[in-house]
């Protein structure tokens, strides 16, 4: 039987789980969902497709229309990919502090890229995206930080995939918080199926907004903008673990060197948070699932892999 996708968007999802054998400690049962297997190499492919599907269904996005979005990078890449496949113009606004690889990939998909002052964080990018959209007839803002189509993608697909692939054997789920859509959607599915699943959110220690701290610069690209997004459901999270940028970098490097998994900085944060949880004696016989959001290839120019070119 032929298996041919109609467009690249049909390749999104059904990413694999792999056992983590070394970096989170010995004698623990940890598996990771590797989202780099999506066509644009990140978990953001999922909600980009979901947001565009919803905008098409509502009539807000017409053929030949324009999609505008503020992003730290991966959502911009994903929207640019799906937009290219469906014939939309795409304008991506991101802080200039994001990696050069992210910028280049957005442009490679034919999208327009607008860079904002890093001092303003993602909030400044959001304001600029709103200004651009207001001046372009037929433009919509994807609004990943407020759009219910974001967590809906993970309720419909990501969470169900994890449950199916583990045959319902999930005791703990650990994930970083960027928009919050991934952890909120996955947690909703897992909690509906088993209310005892323990949900752990990972945040940058330098910007501990989820535990009442103040926003501050940090180096974990993709985690925690300088505000708590509407798409994050705090009520479904049981615990928050804070991870230093340096620790996230260390775990991402170790994932490549010890597991053969070339992943990004936010994946390092997820693994570091998982290691904290997995070290607890009461979880020795429990299955812990984490999610690795993207590939390390778009961080080769950053501090994550500094010095490799020598």
Task: Report the location of each language-model feature.
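PLP-dependent amino-acid enzyme catalytic core
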Residues: 1-310
């Amino acid at each position: 039987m032929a298996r041919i996708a109609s467009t690249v968007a049909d390749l999104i999802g059904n990413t694999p789980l792999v056992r983590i054998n070394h970096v989170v400690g010995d004698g623990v049962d940890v598996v990771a969902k590797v989202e780099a297997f999506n066509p644009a190499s990140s978990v953001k492919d999922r909600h980009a497709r979901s947001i565009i599907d919803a905008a098409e269904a509502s009539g807000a996005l017409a053929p030949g229309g324009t999609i505008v979005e503020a992003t730290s990078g991966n959502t911009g890449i994903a929207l640019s990919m799906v937009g290219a496949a469906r014939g939309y113009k795409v304008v991506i606004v991101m802080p200039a502090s994001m990696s050069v690889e992210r910028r280049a990939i957005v442009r490679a998909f034919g999208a327009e890229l607008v860079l904002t002052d890093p001092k303003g964080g993602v909030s400044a990018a959001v304001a600029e995206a709103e200004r651009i959209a207001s001046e372009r007839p037929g433009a919509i803002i994807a609004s990943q930080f407020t759009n219910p189509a974001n967590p809906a993608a993970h309720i419909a697909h990501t969470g169900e995939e994890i449950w199916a692939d583990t045959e319902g054997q999930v005791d703990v789920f650990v994930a970083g918080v960027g928009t919050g859509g991934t952890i909120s959607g996955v947690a909703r599915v897992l909690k509906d199926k088993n209310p005892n699943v323990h949900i752990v959110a990972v945040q940058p220690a330098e910007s501990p907004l989820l535990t009442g701290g103040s926003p501050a610069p940090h180096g974990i690209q993709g985690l925690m903008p300088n505000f708590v997004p509407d798409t994050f459901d705090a009520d479904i999270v049981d615990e928050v673990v804070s991870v230093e940028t340096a620790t996230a970098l260390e775990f991402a490097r170790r994932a490549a060197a010890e597991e053969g998994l070339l992943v990004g900085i936010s994946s390092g944060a997820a693994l570091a948070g998982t290691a904290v949880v997995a070290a607890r004696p009461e979880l020795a016989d429990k299955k812990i699932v984490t999610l690795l959001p993207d590939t390390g290839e778009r961080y080769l120019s950053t501090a994550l892999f500094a010095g490799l070119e020598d």
